[in-house]
Structure formats: structure tokens, C-alpha cells
């Protein structure tokens, strides 16, 4: 289910943090957090149980609605399925990490955020600092509730009880604020070769009045 506190603004930049799950009726939840880069506002959240490939469509529509927001999907486990589907849909602004392969001496890239023993503490510590310094404005009570139960044990393992999907998605969205930018101009979309160009001509000039899914490009030839 999608909850929106603030609709997209033309001159604002946004980030998406995506925590994925298997999508079973009795399992963990998937979550998408949307943050305003400049103001640190939590502007929207999607939360529910859905297969990872279908989650990609939700992420795509939310991301496009928020001006092609910088999207970061956790690449562990089921997240790879979501990433592959997003790439097939042609989402234009996915986070990717570039690194130099010492053996081939070539640059390689990996889409998404891989949560490891090293990267998870970094991400959570950055989130903690942002909250402590009041850089983030949260509206979701359930997100705040998960933050209150999120702990680190003696072995250094971090988790929430019973769930922490909202926290992890928020941490990724906050991490992306380092790499996102606030647009200096709004690029117009060429609708010439899309099957639904006529439906998108009017709202395309005013994204604040767009309804979610209006700018879906799944029909692009």
C-alpha cells in the first residue's frame, strides 16, 4: 500500500530506498521509502507483501512519479530479481557501484546496495547521525516504531523486532542523498513513439498534478 505525505515538486530531487522480501503471505514485507533530498522529508512510503518481480513495477511508477528519483535496491537475495526487472523496464536512474577489477584491470559495475558486515553498520550509523542531527523529517508512525525496536547485539548484529524493512529502506534512501542531486531544469519527455502519448501530453508539463502511474513508460517502443 502506498502512503503519500507530499506530492512531487518540479524543482525537488528525491531518493528511493527499496528493501525486498520474497512476497509470501506469512513472510517479511517489502518496503519503498521516498525522501526529499534537500529537505530530508519522508514524502512517501510503499509497504506490503508482493513478489520481487512485481515490486519492480511499483518502484518504477513511484520513481518516475517523483521525477526519476535515484533508486537504490538492496541487492541481496530477492533484490536481484527486482533490480533485473527494473533494468528491463528501463528505469533511468538506478544506483550502481563502480569498482576496478584488479585481475582484468577493467571497471565493473554492480547495481543496488549489497548489505554486508561492513556496509550495513555504515548505512545504519549514517541514518543514526541524520536522525540525531535532525536532518530527516519522518511522518510514518510505523517507521518510527521500527526505529525504536532496532538494536545492535553484543556480536554487532543489527535488526528490529519483529520487522525492520522500513528501517532498512529508510537507511538506503538516506544513503542515496550523498549521490543524488537537485535538478536545475526539468527535462521534457519525448512522447512521439509511445502508445499513450495523448494521455500524457497534458499532465507532463505539471508533475505536481500527476497521478501515480501516469508517467509509466512500460509501453515505450
Give the positions of each predicted feature:
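RNase H-like, metal-dependent nuclease domains and their acidic two-metal-ion catalytic environment used
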Residues: 1-98, 105-109, 121, 125, ...
Amino acid at each position: 500500500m502506498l502512503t503519500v505525505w507530499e506530492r512531487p515538486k518540479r524543482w525537488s530531487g528525491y531518493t528511493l530506498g527499496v528493501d525486498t522480501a520474497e512476497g509470501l503471505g506469512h513472510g517479511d514485507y517489502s518496503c519503498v521509502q521516498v525522501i526529499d533530498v534537500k529537505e530530508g522529508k519522508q514524502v512517501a512510503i510503499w509497504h506490503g507483501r508482493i513478489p520481487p518481480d512485481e515490486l519492480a513495477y511499483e518502484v518504477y511508477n513511484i520513481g518516475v512519479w517523483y521525477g526519476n528519483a535515484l533508486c537504490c535496491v538492496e541487492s541481496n537475495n530477492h533484490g536481484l530479481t527486482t533490480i533485473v526487472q527494473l533494468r528491463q523496464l528501463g528505469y533511468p536512474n538506478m544506483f550502481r557501484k563502480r569498482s576496478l577489477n584488479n585481475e582484468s584491470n577493467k571497471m565493473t559495475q554492480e547495481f543496488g546496495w549489497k548489505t554486508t558486515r561492513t556496509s550495513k553498520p555504515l548505512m545504519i550509523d549514517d541514518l543514526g547521525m541524520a536522525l540525531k542531527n535532525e536532518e530527516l523529517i519522518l511522518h510514518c508512525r510505523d517507521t518510527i516504531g521500527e526505529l525504536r525496536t532496532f538494536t545492535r547485539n553484543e556480536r554487532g548484529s543489527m535488526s528490529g523486532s519483529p520487522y525492520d524493512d522500513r528501517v532498512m529502506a529508510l537507511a538506503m534512501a538516506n544513503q542515496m542523498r550523498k549521490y543524488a542531486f537537485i535538478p536545475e531544469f526539468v527535462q521534457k519527455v519525448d512522447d512521439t513513439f509511445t502508445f499513450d502519448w495523448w494521455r500524457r501530453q497534458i499532465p507532463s508539463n505539471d508533475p505536481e498534478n500527476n497521478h501515480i502511474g501516469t508517467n509509466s513508460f512500460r509501453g515505450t517502443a
